[in-house]
Each structure stands twice: as structure tokens, then as C-alpha cells.
Amino acid sequence: MSAATAAAAASGIQSTAGAIPMRNEKGELSMQKVKVQRYISGKRPDYARADSSSEESDDDDFIDTRKRLERHKAERHKLELSRQGGSAEGEERAAGEGQEEDDAEVDDPRLRRLRQRPVDMEDMERERRERHRHIHEPEIMESDSEDEEEDEGAQGAIQRGTNKITLASESDTDAELSDTELENRRTKLRSRMLQQQREEEVLQKEDEKQSESSESESSEYEEETESEEDNEPRLKPLFVRKRDRATIQEKEREAQKQKQLEAEAKRAAKERRRATLRMVEESVKKDLEKTKPETNEACIEDVCTDDENDEVEYEAWKLRELKRMKRDREERDNVEREKLDIDRMRNMTEEERRQELRQNPKVVTNKATKGKYKFLQKYYHRGAFYLDEENDVLKRDFAQATLEDHFDKTILPKVMQVKNFGRCGRTKYTHLVDQDTTKFDSPWYAESSSNIKFHNEHAGGMRQQFDKPTGSKRKKME
């Protein structure tokens, strides 16, 4: 609970709506009403000054546009009645209406300022000009005789534009002034415009005279321009970066153009060289076509057969043909014999097939001795082809060391005793014997009768049974 509420409760006040506790001169608390100042758009608050300067009047005060127009209409109506010389009743009625409006508008600060304005028309004109914007007309410092007429036309257009602007600005203030003031203002404007026209005509005549005498006064004109240039205000020096300077940019452009010209010259030289090569090629082709015979048929005279003996060549051909026929027949017989052997071996049982291989082993014509491999030597398999051919190349020892295998790798450290050491294809292991964990002293590997019996009965692949399982056995297994 706040202090104000506690004080109100202590003083016996039951309701505090729209009132606050206040302490009087005697020190007693009492509830006093609070006057709430409502905000009204356009109304001057009580704490603001009633009169303000002419500069702040346009922003501080606000009067409804509709009321201002009605006031101007009433004033104009009163003036019209007075001019027409109406009856006394009309004058009294107009005077009464004007008096009522004046009484109603006495408190308007804008009307008070309007009445207090100076009566002098020149002061009024000066104030009006100060209120409105100023248009700075261009000044022609130097001009040639040819460009003077164009500049005069542009200046006249700007002058007319300024006159229009002043007329438009004056039309806004016409509503606030009486008809007599408006007529006086318009007469002044007309006289000023006439004076401007006369001045323009005088200036045109003077310009024509100056254009005629411009040739004789060229030297004087140059001196005047120099003096004017000296009197001109000096500009502040501005720093320009190196890459933005005109001289650097021009040099870069020249260098770029030079490079382009050199590239174009090289390209043109290449094109000329290609054109000359094409011309030479075409000329050579034309010469060959001229020397070439018209018929494309083969001429037997082109082949020299003076040293040949037809009978000897025929006998050699016959011998080659007989050998070819014999070789083809032997190849066909061998293929048929191999097919018969394959069919016969397929029809044999496993025991018969083993016995047949023991009695008739495969004959290797070019069988080579088995070589000895070094530590970490790369192994190459001989393969199963060309075993029945008599050739010295096929009988060579292919287990000999090559390239890096000539070196003894047993003297290397343990870390380096791997294949492709230091490469992406490096292996972790050296050989299978090194990784073998078989314990030959274990009783599982002892050659006892019980181990041999167990191995023959239960070891995988020891039973030679290759019977195809029947459907009944498969069902039982399922």
C-alpha cells in the first residue's frame, strides 16, 4: 500500500477517485481534485506563450483551414456590400456580422499579428520575399559572341520561371489580404515586369554593340580574363592516389594497347605462315596430279622379275603348303584326342582316376629345375601354358632374383623387413611362417594311433564319398 493511500485512510477519506491527498499550509492532509488537461489537436496548451515571434508562428500555432476560409469570405462579402452602396440595413447587418466575427476572433494570435504588421508595402514585399525561397540565377562570367544569344535566351527563360514562382507564391497569400492591397501589389508587379523587359532590350542592344567591336578588343579581353582568373578563389589541393591519376592510367592504357598490337602481329604472322604452307601443299598436289597416269590399273611391268625362277618358287610353295596341311591335321587330331580323354576321365570313379594319373603322368616337355628363393623375394608363378613346347626360353630358371631382390634383406632391421617399406603398398607381415602359431609339441599333433584314427574318421575331406543325395535323405535332414 502506497503512502498516499495510507494518508487518505488515516484522514477518514473513503474514495480517492479523481483526487490526491495534498498538505495545506497548516500541515493537514486533504483530498483535492486533479484537473486533467485533455490533449486537443491544434490547440495551444496553457503553459505555452500567448504571443510568439514571427519566425516561430508558422510552426507553433495551428488554425483550422475551414474557419480561415469562412473568415475571408465574410470579409469579402462585407467589402462588396460597402462598395455597392447598399442600404443602411445591409451595412448594419454586415457591420454586426463583422463585429461578431471580430469579437469571436479577438483571441486568435495570428489575427493579432496580422493587424500589427507594418502598413508600408515595401516592407510587406520584403517580408514576403524573405519567407519564400530564393532562386539564384546563373551569372555568365565569360562568353563568346556566338554563345551570347543562347545564354540570353536561357536567362530569359529562368527569369520567366522566377516570375511564375513569385506569382504562384503570391497567390497563396492573396487569401489573407484585402482587395485594395491585392490591386496595389498587382500594379507593382506589372511595373516591375515592364521595367525588366526594358532592361532586357537595353542589354540586347549593348550585347550587339559589343559583338561588333569584339574583334578589335580581343587583346583587352584577354587581359581582363587573366585578371579575372587571378582574382578567382584558389581551390584547396586534393590528394589523388597513384592508381587514380590520369598519367598512370594513360601509361597503363598505352602498355595494354602495345601488348594487343604485338599479339595481333604474332597472330597475323602465324596466319601468313599457314597460308603459305597451304599454297605450297596445293602446288605440290597439282604437280603430282599432272605426272600421275590417267589409268589406275596395276601394271605388271612395275614389278621386276628378272632374278626369279618360276620352277624353284613353285617347289618351295608346294613344300610350305604340305607342311601347313600336316600341321592343321595334327592339331585336329590332338583336339579330338583330348576330348576323348576328357570324356573317359569323367566316366571313371575317383579310385580309377587316381590310378590312371599314376600310370600315365602328365608329360612336361620343357620342365625346369625348381629354384631357391631368398628372404622376402618376390614370387612369380610359371603358369600352366606352353608346357609341351620345345623352347630354350621356356626352360630357363624363372626363380632367379631380379631388381631389388638381389640385395640381402636379412641384415636389415626388424622394422624394415617388410615388403614395400616406406610406400603406400607396405605390408604388415613378412611371411606366413612368421605368423604361424602352431605348437608342434602339442598332443593334438602327436602321431599316435588314436590321433590317426580320429583324423581319418572325423577330419574334413577324408571320406571319399561323392554320392548325390536323394530326395528322401534331404527330407530326413530337414
Curated annotation (Swiss-Prot):
Residues 160-170 have a biased composition (Polar residues). Residues 229-478 are annotated as: Interaction with Prp38. Residues 1-20 have a biased composition (Low complexity). Its main location: nucleus. Belongs to the MFAP1 family. Component of the spliceosome B complex. Interacts (via C-terminus) with Prp38. This is Microfibrillar-associated protein 1. It comes from Drosophila melanogaster (Fruit fly).
